[in-house]
Amino acid sequence: MLSTDTIYALSSGSLPAGVAIIRVSGPETADALVRLCGTLPPPRIATLRTIRTRNGETLDSGLVLYFPTPASFTGEDCCELQVHGGRAVVSAILDELAATGGLRHAEAGEFARRAFQNGKLDLVEVEGLADLIAAETEMQRRLAIEQSGGGQSALYAGWARRLTHSRAMIEAELDFADEDDVPGSVSAVIWEDVGRLRQEIDGHIARAGLAEIIRDGLKIVIAGEPNAGKSSLLNALARRDIAIVTEVAGTTRDVLSVDLSLAGFSVKLFDTAGLRETDELVEREGIRRARQVIADADLVLLLSEKPGHFRIDEVLPENVPVIRVATKVDRPSPSWAPSDADIFLSTRTGEGMADLLTALQSHLPDLAGRTALAMPSRKRHVDCLRQASAALERSLISSDLELRAEQLRQAGDALGRITGRVDVENLLDVIFSEFCIGK
């Protein structure tokens, strides 16, 4: 059910700031603008206005933009007040809006929710918008742009149209098999396309792991025996002191982490307790947590200050790549052979750091030359795609034409749930809660 309330909120960042943007949306927008500014500005033209209280007291002056329905972000009458970003200025304008009848403060994500309800955005675009606001790396920005700009939705819509066409032809064959204007056997052509569509969906699902790395970061765990230089490496890569570094073995008792940006990708770097047998209770808990983090790693940096001490096989998950890093190589002993490690490093002198960064980048996904990042970025997308693929598989192996048509309908519904065109009411509160108040 669509709301008839008119809502307002600060849509820009935290105060104070050079400029603050206050957004209003709903049927009372035009009246609220007239009360604040005296006259309604021309649609979609930034106009300088003095903003006053009901008693004529000047609150501020700024640019005002008015977007009549339906050509606005929310699809409703909407306006933006671009004013000076002082706390007192913004507070006074918000108080004046609150005192205006028919207006209320917006809830988190309510502007975006109205855009969805009014058909201005689908759910994939809404989620992409949330990701774009939260993006911290270049690859996160590119992935979010692909979704918020409608590229991903266009792909799903194309698949849905193919399913609709297939269903229509099959229904025609079922209902009008005796009619001359209905092809006698469309099944062969239709099911070939359904098979191709299933392959396309499965290929799309296979890229979900890459999207997860882009959104959530590549998990790199620094592991090794106590006093191997793990905390020093964490500090060196982070370029600031995060972990305590001493010559005492077992200093790190808990898992420490830091977020980095590497070649446009988000990287989550974990420093762990040294792996050894110990009776000390707190250190044992730290080692247990270290093993847990290693089990979830995308890449392990295995450190040792001595040749032949790269021992982690008992806790390393299958198929997780390992880079063996020889540490403290600025010391005169021990002596390392070239085959003893992959990287030879000294965090004190910086020797080997460039080689390590190059090695880390080689484990990042290769997206060179790819202009679009069409891939499912959320678990719910993958779940719906798997449901669609499973329904298509059932349709391909079934012998009953009516059952096959029903499986195509289920596949189409699964695709529709991704964009929000089918049965998603229970998801909306979760999705829109990711937004700030003014979005």
UniProtKB/Swiss-Prot annotation:
Cross-referenced InterPro entries: G_TrmE, GTP-bd, GTP-bd_TrmE_N, GTPase_MnmE, MnmE_dom2, MnmE_helical, P-loop_NTPase, Small_GTP-bd
Family annotation (SUPFAM superfamilies): P-loop containing nucleoside triphosphate hydrolases, TrmE connector domain
Gene designation per UniProt: mnmE
Pfam families linked: MMR_HSR1 (PF01926), MnmE_helical (PF12631), TrmE_N (PF10396)
Residues annotated to bind K(+): N227, T246, V248, T251
Cofactor annotation remark: Binds 1 potassium ion per subunit.
Organism: Rhizobium meliloti (strain 1021) (Ensifer meliloti)
Residues bound to GTP: 227-232, 246-252, 271-274
A GO BP entry: tRNA wobble uridine modification
PANTHER family the UniProt entry points to: TRNA MODIFICATION GTPASE GTPBP3, TRNA MODIFICATION GTPASE GTPBP3, MITOCHONDRIAL
Function: Exhibits a very high intrinsic GTPase hydrolysis rate. Involved in the addition of a carboxymethylaminomethyl (cmnm) group at the wobble position (U34) of certain tRNAs, forming tRNA-cmnm(5)s(2)U34.
Subunit structure: Homodimer. Heterotetramer of two MnmE and two MnmG subunits.
Record's GO cellular component terms: cytoplasm
Lineage: Bacteria, Pseudomonadati, Pseudomonadota, Alphaproteobacteria, Hyphomicrobiales
GO-annotated molecular function: GTP binding; GTPase activity; metal ion binding
Protein name as annotated: tRNA modification GTPase MnmE
Source domain of life: Bacteria
Enzyme class, UniProt record, top EC level: hydrolase
Domain TrmE-type G: 217-365
Binding, (6S)-5-formyl-5,6,7,8-tetrahydrofolate: R23, E80, K120, K439
Protein family per UniProt: Belongs to the TRAFAC class TrmE-Era-EngA-EngB-Septin-like GTPase superfamily. TrmE GTPase family.
Cell compartment(s), UniProt: Cytoplasm
Cofactor(s) recorded in Swiss-Prot or TrEMBL: K(+)
E.C. number: 3.6.-.-
